[in-house]
C-alpha cells in the first residue's frame, strides 16, 4: 500500500483564509496536513501564479489578476531557460511566490502519518494561460512540451523538500481542467491527454497523486498510472456499477482514494450531518464490494476522507439570495474540516480500523 490511509483526513490545497497562521493550524489539524494556497493573502499564493515561477514567456498582470504569455518573450527567454533547466533551484517555490509553503516547512512535521503538497497540473495550466491571441498555450506544441517537463520537475523538487520533513510525503497534481479534454470543442482530446499524462505521471518521484474536483470519469483517471486519486465524490450522487471494476482493480494494486465527501456550499452543507455523509460514502463502497467482491474493510483501509471542493466563493449563498456573511467561506471550510474528523471516526469504528 502507498500509505496507511485508514479513513484518515486531508483536504485540497486552496483555502479562502487571509490569515496564514489560522489556515496553517487548520491544515495541521488533519491526519495528513498540507501547505495551504491562500489567494486572498496575495496573488502570488494563487495556484496558477505559483506554478508559473520561472516558466519562460510568462509575466503576471497584477492589475487584472492573471498570467500573461507572450510568444515573442517565450522565444527570447528559451535559451536562458535551457541553461538552467537542470538546476533544482529553477523549480523551487520561493518565499516570494509562497510565504505559506516556507512557514509549513518550518514546522515539526515528523509526527504525522504523511504530509502532502500540491501543484497545478499541466493540462489545467495549459488551458488557463492564454497567449496574445487569447489562445491557450496547450495548443502551442513547443510551450506544451516544456510545460509538462517543467511542472514535472517542479513537483519533484517540492516532493524532495517535503520528504526532508517527513519520509511519507507526497505531492498531488491539481487538475481541475482535466475535464475539458472530454469536450469536443477543446481541440485537445481525452486520448491525446491520456498519452501525455501517463508519461508525465511516470516521471514523478514519490507516490503519484492526482486531484480533480470537476465532473469525473473514474475509469479514465484510474488508468493514468496514478497511485493516489482525490476527487469530488459528493457531486456524483451515487457510485455507478460500471465504475466498480476500475475502482476495485486500482485498490487491489495498492492505490489510495481520497473521497471528497463533505460539500463546501453553505446551502448544501446546512442540511448534511457527518452521519449522513458517512452513510453516503458507505453506500458507494457497498456498490463496489457487491459488484467485485472486494472487501468493504479493504476499501476503507485504502480511503482518505476530504472536503468535496475548495471554497473561495460560497455558491450556496449566491443561489439562495441570502445576505452575505463576513468571512462566510472561512466558516464553511472550518465546518467542513470539523465534519471530516467525525466522519473519519464513524467509518473507523464501523470498519474496525
Predicted segments, located by residue:
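A short, acidic, amphipathic alpha-helical segment used as a generic capping/interface helix at domain edges
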Residues: 240-247, 273-298
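Active-site beta-loop-alpha junctions enriched in small/polar residues
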Residues: 120-122, 176-178, 213-217, 234-236, ...
Amino acid at each position: 500500500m502507498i500509505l496507511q490511509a485508514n479513513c484518515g483526513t486531508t483536504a485540497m490545497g486552496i483555502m479562502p483564509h487571509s490569515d496564514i497562521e489560522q489556515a496553517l493550524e487548520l491544515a495541521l489539524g488533519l491526519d495528513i496536513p498540507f501547505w495551504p494556497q491562500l489567494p486572498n493573502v496575495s496573488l502570488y499564493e494563487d495556484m496558477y501564479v505559483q506554478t508559473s515561477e520561472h516558466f519562460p514567456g510568462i509575466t503576471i498582470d497584477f492589475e487584472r489578476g492573471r498570467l500573461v504569455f507572450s510568444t515573442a518573450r517565450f522565444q527570447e527567454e528559451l535559451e536562458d531557460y535551457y541553461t538552467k533547466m537542470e538546476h533544482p533551484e529553477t523549480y523551487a517555490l520561493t518565499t516570494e511566490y509562497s510565504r505559506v509553503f516556507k512557514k509549513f516547512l518550518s514546522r515539526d512535521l515528523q509526527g504525522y502519518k504523511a504530509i502532502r503538497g500540491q501543484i497545478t497540473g499541466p493540462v489545467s495550466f495549459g488551458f488557463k494561460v492564454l497567449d496574445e491571441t487569447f489562445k491557450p498555450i496547450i495548443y502551442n506544441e513547443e510551450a506544451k512540451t516544456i510545460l509538462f517537463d517543467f511542472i514535472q520537475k517542479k513537483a519533484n523538487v517540492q516532493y524532495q523538500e517535503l520528504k526532508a520533513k517527513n519520509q511519507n510525503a507526497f505531492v498531488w497534481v491539481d487538475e481541475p481542467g482535466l475535464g475539458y479534454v472530454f469536450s469536443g470543442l477543446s481541440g485537445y482530446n481525452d486520448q491525446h491527454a491520456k498519452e501525455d499524462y501517463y508519461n508525465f505521471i511516470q516521471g514523478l518521484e514519490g507516490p503519484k497523486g492526482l486531484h480533480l474536483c470537476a465532473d469525473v470519469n473514474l475509469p479514465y483517471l484510474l488508468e493514468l498510472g496514478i497511485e493516489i486519486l482525490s476527487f469530488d465524490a459528493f457531486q456524483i450522487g451515487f457510485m455507478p456499477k460500471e465504475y466498480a471494476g476500475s475502482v476495485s482493480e486500482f485498490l487491489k494494486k495498492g492505490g489510495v482514494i481520497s473521497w471528497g465527501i463533505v460539500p463546501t456550499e453553505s446551502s448544501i452543507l446546512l442540511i448534511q450531518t457527518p452521519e449522513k455523509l458517512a452513510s453516503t460514502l458507505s453506500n458507494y463502497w457497498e456498490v463496489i464490494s457487491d459488484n467485485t467482491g472486494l472487501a468493504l474493510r479493504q476499501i476503507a483501509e485504502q480511503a482518505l476522507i476530504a472536503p468535496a471542493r475548495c471554497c473561495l466563493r460560497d455558491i450556496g449563498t449566491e443561489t439562495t439570495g441570502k445576505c452575505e456573511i463576513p468571512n462566510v467561506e472561512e466558516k464553511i471550510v472550518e465546518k467542513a474540516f470539523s465534519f471530516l474528523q467525525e466522519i473519519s471516526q464513524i467509518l473507523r469504528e464501523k470498519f474496525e480500523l
